[in-house]
């Protein structure tokens, strides 16, 4: 049997079931086995590994994962795909498809039911563009015990995850993801290898979870509030953004100026020029003056 991720097999499956693509669910099926193999290779899935997939579609990536992993768990929100997955994944007894929205699912419960304690597990997925960021944050903030993520996403989002200070792509998303993970751009994927063809190119991004966050902060929630406030209006200075947008902090420019100067940060700088280490230093200094 041909792999699912070929133009002809994908076309046959879609036509057999009269499947119509839902734009609202970001459904674009990959039809290039080489790209799928690059994804699975970079996930370093072995015979004892587990994999969590989100949005399996008709099972193209799921199939490649099932060939290598001990166990694959796939979350699929679209009920119309369940009978298709039953057929396409029938040769693989190590796959469980869960008909749930991963954003609403109790992922810890699923994890403990489906995987062995201490098992090496990776999240490997071609993520729907419209919910890429919420999915990553849910799994990171809930501290799911996975080794990391190898995910396909809109190239523009991938560029933001990997961005360095001083670039136009660098922002609060870059800092939040890099706080938890080491980010690597594996490859750019052209729009031409999808059916239907999306309007933008994609990127495969590998995120390996850090044993502990890259910087030490006194108050994690406040740290991210400082970061978000600093990027609220990109053209404004750090001083203006923090004085106007940092909730729970005195509206006192003199105090802000003093703290920024004390930690060696020019109040006239813009948020996009600060490294994650500088944000940690700033947050740890500001938190001492936070309103209770």
Curated annotation (Swiss-Prot):
GO terms for molecular function: 16S rRNA (adenine(1518)-N(6)/adenine(1519)-N(6))-dimethyltransferase activity; RNA binding. S-adenosyl-L-methionine binds at residues 28, 30, 55, 76, 101, 126. It holds the Pfam family RrnaAD. InterPro entries: KsgA/Erm, rRNA_Ade_diMease-like_C, rRNA_Ade_Mease_Trfase_CS, rRNA_Ade_methylase_Trfase_N, rRNA_adenine_dimethylase, SAM-dependent_MTases_sf. SUPFAM superfamilies: S-adenosyl-L-methionine-dependent methyltransferases. One of its GO terms (cellular component) is cytosol. Disulfide bonds: none annotated. Keywords: Cytoplasm, Methyltransferase, RNA-binding, rRNA processing, S-adenosyl-L-methionine, Transferase. Specifically dimethylates two adjacent adenosines (A1518 and A1519) in the loop of a conserved hairpin near the 3'-end of 16S rRNA in the 30S particle. May play a critical role in biogenesis of 30S subunits. Belongs to the class I-like SAM-binding methyltransferase superfamily. rRNA adenine N(6)-methyltransferase family. RsmA subfamily. NCBIfam families: ksgA. This is Ribosomal RNA small subunit methyltransferase A. It comes from Bacillus thuringiensis (strain Al Hakam). The lineage of its organism: Bacteria, Bacillati, Bacillota, Bacilli, Bacillales. The gene is rsmA.
């Amino acid at each position: 049997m041909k792999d699912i991720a070929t133009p002809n097999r994908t076309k046959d499956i879609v036509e057999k079931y009269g499947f119509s693509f839902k734009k609202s669910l970001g459904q674009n099926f990959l039809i290039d086995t080489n790209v799928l193999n690059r994804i699975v290779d970079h996930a370093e899935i072995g015979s004892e590994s587990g994999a969590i997939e989100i949005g399996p579609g008709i099972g193209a990536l799921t199939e490649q994962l099932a060939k290598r992993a001990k166990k694959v768990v796939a979350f699929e929100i679209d009920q119309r795909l369940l009978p298709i997955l039953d057929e396409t994944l029938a040769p693989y007894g190590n796959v469980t498809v869960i008909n749930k929205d991963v954003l609403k699912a109790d992922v810890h419960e699923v994890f403990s039911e489906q995987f062995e304690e201490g098992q090496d597990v990776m999240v490997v997925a071609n993520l729907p563009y419209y919910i890429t960021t919420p999915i990553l944050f849910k799994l990171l903030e809930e501290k799911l015990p996975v080794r990391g993520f190898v995910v396909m996403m809109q190239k523009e989002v991938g560029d933001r995850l990997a961005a360095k200070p001083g670039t136009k792509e660098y922002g609060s998303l870059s800092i939040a993801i890099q706080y938890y993970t080491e980010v690597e751009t594996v490859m750019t994927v052209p729009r031409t290898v999808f059916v239907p063809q999306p309007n933008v190119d994609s990127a495969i991004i590998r995120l390996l979870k850090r044993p502990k966050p890259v910087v030490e902060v006194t108050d994690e929630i406040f740290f991210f509030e400082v970061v978000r406030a600093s990027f609220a209006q990109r053209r404004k200075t750090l001083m203006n953004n923090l004085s106007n947008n940092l909730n729970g902090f005195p509206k006192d420019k003199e105090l802000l100026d003093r703290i920024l100067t004390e930690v060696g940060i020019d109040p006239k700088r813009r948020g996009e020029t600060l490294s994650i280490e500088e944000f940690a230093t700033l947050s740890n200094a500001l938190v001492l003056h936070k309103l209770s």
